[in-house]
Amino acid sequence: MQIADARARCAQLEHLNIFITMTDETGPGEVVAVKDLIDVRGTPTSAGSTVLPMDPKAEDAPLIDTLRGSGCVMIGKTNMDEWALGSTSNNPHYGIVRNPSDLSRIAGGSSGGSAAAVAAGICDWSIGTDTGGSVRIPAALCGVVGFKPTLDTIDTTGVLPLSFSLDTVGSLASDVRTATRGVALMAGKEGWEPASAPALGDLRLAVPGGWVTGLDETVGAVWMTVASQLQLPEIPFPPLSELAKGCLDLMSAEAAAYHRRWISECPERYGPHALARLRGMYAVAGADYVDAVAGRDPLRAAVAEAMDGYDAVLVPTTAAVAPLIQGRINSEPLTRFTRAFNYTGQPVFSLPIKTSGLPVGIQVVGRIGRDAELAAIALALEQVWSGGRAKH
């Protein structure tokens, strides 16, 4: 994609509210959209908020500097949930990011602008961050690929935090190879992009026992087709609620600590949702935070043991399709299946499934540090599903 063509398309789709700021960069390289938590030289970093000064950054975050070394061109900074505190990208300061699949519905969050940029064809790929599902949720709702690599794969220096124990930089793209290449470029890894896919029959895939319940009609129908097609066995697995609680307790305590001074000095600069969310996070007891820290390694070990003999586990990315912008939005079905894998730190792809209606995403979850192997598995599933065999 040429940067001039990308800018022209962006101008045509201004009503989607995808970007907060644009760059004036030129060049022949891959066009990349960057979530506005990440420092890009010459642009401010807002975190989707009005708390911070809007002064242009003098330096790139290291991951952006690495991308420039590969010839990438940054088109702009994408809209998001304020301070990444949400799963809708309905931003009170910079506008609601609209889902390119249906303009009356949310794009998901918190990396909604990054997902919408890919879905709308404005960039070659985009960068998001994922602390409790913020790459995978909008990827699923917008019908694109989202890749959250193993925790700490990509340097988060120059990335504003939500939770230092959980924050993970990831990629969004229209296909597995591009999403994998994006993460590999940011991480300075070689050999990650799969040259070929393994035979589907050679893969050992499963679903965590007792996890997948309460799906809406569209997601439920797609999941039944996928589980039947792949003949997924249910395997014993640590409880979803226990893993998700560990993630939420870490996130809440660390976010509350980071925002404590601003909440005290300038609460009026926060939107109502972010302010209420942060104030609620102060309710996490110190004992719960200590338990979440202490329990993380044992639960990681339990998950690794449960996956022994399997290449990956699959679960829906969200329990529901993209909600309507108007009306009350229940975030629980959007975050139900994602937070667990931030707590464990495992690599995860969200792969889109074509339906006759709104997009649906399926998570493909691998082992810690085996991101390249997971990319090959995701490619195999993408090739099957893009051929229509998993359509509902």
What do the PLM-derived regions correspond to, one by one?
Residues M1-P56, A61, W83-G86, A322, ...:
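Short, well-ordered alpha-helical
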Residues M1-T26, L185-T335, Y343, Q383-H392:
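Amidase signature
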